[in-house]
Regions:
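Conserved C-terminal structural/oligomerization subdomain of aldehyde/semialdehyde dehydrogenase
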Residues: 1-104
C-alpha cells in the first residue's frame, strides 16, 4: 500500500490490518522512512517489544502527543524532517568548550 510507505505531513492516518506481531513489524519497517510510528494496545509487554523493533525515531503509544523539544527526536532511514526539533539536536549546531582557571 503506497500511502503506508510515503512520508506524509498532514492529517493522514494509515491503519492496516495484520495477523500477528511479525507481520505488523514487517509492514511498519517496509518503508524508506521512519520518523513516527504509533502503537495502540493495552498490553505494555507487547508494546515494549514492538517499540524496540520498529525502525522509527519516535514511537507513540496510545496517544497523539507530539512531545516537546526537551525530548530527543530524530528520524530513521531517509527521514530528515524533525531531526532538528529537539534540544538534543542543538548539539549538532554547537561546540562545547570548558576553560578552567585557577586563581591564586
Amino acid at each position: 500500500m503506497k500511502v503506508a510507505k510515503e512520508e506524509i505531513f498532514g492529517p493522514v492516518l494509515c491503519a492496516i490490518d495484520f495477523e500477528n506481531e511479525d507481520e505488523a513489524l514487517q509492514i511498519a519497517n517496509d518503508t524508506n522512512y521512519g520518523l513516527n510510528a504509533m502503537i495502540w494496545s493495552n498490553d505494555l509487554n507487547k508494546v515494549h517489544k514492538l517499540a524496540k523493533r520498529i525502525k522509527s525515531g519516535k514511537v507513540l503509544v496510545n496517544n497523539l502527543s507530539d512531545g516537546d523539544m526537551s525530548l530527543p527526536h530524530g528520524g530513521f532511514k531517509q527521514s530528515g524532517f524533525g531531526r532538528d526539533k529537539s534540544l538534543e539536536a542543538l548539539g549538532q549546531y554547537t561546540q562545547s568548550k570548558l576553560t578552567l582557571i585557577e586563581i591564586k
